From Swiss-Prot:
Modified residues annotated as N6-(pyridoxal phosphate)lysine in this record: 204
Record's keyword annotation contains Repeat: no
Family named by the database record: Belongs to the SelA family.
Entries under SUPFAM superfamilies matching the protein: PLP-dependent transferases
Needed cofactors: pyridoxal 5'-phosphate
InterPro entries on file: PyrdxlP-dep_Trfase, PyrdxlP-dep_Trfase_major, SelA-like
Protein name: Uncharacterized protein mlr3804
Stored Gene3D superfamilies: Type I PLP-dependent aspartate aminotransferase-like (Major domain)
Keyword set includes Endoplasmic reticulum: no
Length: 383
């Protein structure tokens, strides 16, 4: 196992987060204790509700499981028999979920699979680049259990209905709205804007253990929680993750956000200065696409650098320690550096490596490689 420098972000494939000390302590403290899990989740509900403005909440294994549980809950309500019969036997249940086509993303797995695991049918609304109000309105019928709205940099960032518009249409037809806000900093805004249930990550910006946070209307949260007696049994969360996430939520309240922001800005400026004047390289500090309070460095790579964006990203990852960049748009000739997950001294290492790789006389063999979606390495695990 090799240590890496993460300038990609809070990615599950890279370990999700650097857990804050408060969460580590809470996890260690509860690890050797017996607890009644429903009571622990009741305590978590109080913390989640206070910080999000929801009526109730609970902790689950991750956001993907939270989506499945919330959708299943919208289908079954509190019918324990219906809960046991999912996902195959939906009977007379409402079992369709409306989602804008531009929101059907892959976050490591396709989001529509999280819907289907609940036993629900995915009903796409609109086109990849445009959703009109009538697309959603006409997709809703007597079988619709919920509308799912995704807030993420992965979604199409133009032409989609706003959350307010989506909620207005769904609510006019008596359909609850579930929001996937895994990476979002705003713990209160989505419920305030009309969502009925919101799902957050406990391990991304909160820096807790791998977990999901479900919050919102009490009846829907209760129905989602009861899925632990059904499809969510395979997604169960441990006491350590519940305690750690509660601690991370409370630590978030007290965190020096202004100080963290200053450190992130210093790293971005350091990297931008390191790239100044290098042939074929243009660096710009840009805001987060979903309006989280953070910036990233976007690095444009042209042939004059004797690299492609994919080739430069590969060269940084090939060093020691590997530097893993945010490369989800690398085929467009650029990638990003995210400053949010650095240990002390790592920003300087990144700056030095960037300069060294780009000023070296020779280039690696794959410097000009094209971006490819190659899954062959995945299929070789664990070799």
């Amino acid at each position: 196992m090799r240590p890496i420098i993460n300038v990609s972000g809070t990615m599950t494939a890279l370990g999700a987060s650097i857990i804050v000390p408060e969460a580590i302590s809470a996890m260690a403290e509860i690890a050797s204790q017996w607890v009644e899990m429903d009571d622990l989740q009741r305590a978590a509900s109080t913390v989640v509700a206070r910080l999000t403005g929801g009526e109730a909440g609970f902790i689950t294994a991750c956001c993907a499981s939270g989506i499945t549980m919330a959708i299943a809950g919208a289908m079954t309500g509190t019918s324990l028999l219906a809960i046991e019969r999912l996902p195959d036997d939906t009977g007379d249940l409402k079992s369709e979920v409306v989602i804008q086509l531009g929101h059907i993303v892959n976050y490591g797995a396709p989001i529509d699979q999280s819907i289907r695991v609940a036993g629900a049918k995915v009903v796409p609304a609109g086109t990849v680049s445009v959703t009109q109000d009538y697309h959603v309105r006409e997709a809703i019928n007597e079988r619709t259990a919920a509308g799912l709205y995704v807030v993420a940099h992965h979604t199409v960032q133009y032409g989609m209905l706003s959350l307010e518009e989506f909620c207005e249409i769904c609510h006019a037809k008596g359909v609850p709205v579930i929001v996937d806000a895994a990476s979002e900093y705003d713990l209160r805004g989505f419920l305030a804007r009309g969502a009925d249930v919101v799902i957050y990550s406990g391990h991304k910006f909160l820096s807790g253990p791998t977990s999901g946070i479900v919050t919102g209307r009490k009846d829907l949260v209760r129905a989602a929680y009861l899925q632990n007696r059904g499809v969510a049994r395979a997604m169960k969360v441990g006491k350590e993750s519940i305690a750690g996430t509660m601690a991370a939520l409370e630590a978030w309240e007290k965190r020096d956000h202004a100080g963290i922001r200053r450190r992130e800005e210093a790293a971005l400026n350091l990297w931008k200065d390191a790239l100044q004047g290098l042939p074929g390289i243009l660096a710009k500090i840009i805001p987060d696409p979903t309006a989280n309070p953070l910036d990233r460095l976007q690095i444009f790579v042209s042939p004059e650098s004797r690299f492609t964006a994919a080739g430069l990203a590969s060269a940084l990852a090939a060093g020691s320690p590997p530097i893993i960049v945010r490369n989800h748009e690398v085929e467009r000739g650029h990638f990003f550096l995210d400053p949010c997950n650095l240990h002390p001294g790592e920003a300087e290492i990144v700056a030095e490596r960037l300069r060294a790789v780009l000023t070296a006389k020779d280039r690696p063999a794959d410097a000009m490689k094209a971006a490819r979606k190659d899954s062959s390495g995945v299929l070789k695990w664990p070799d």
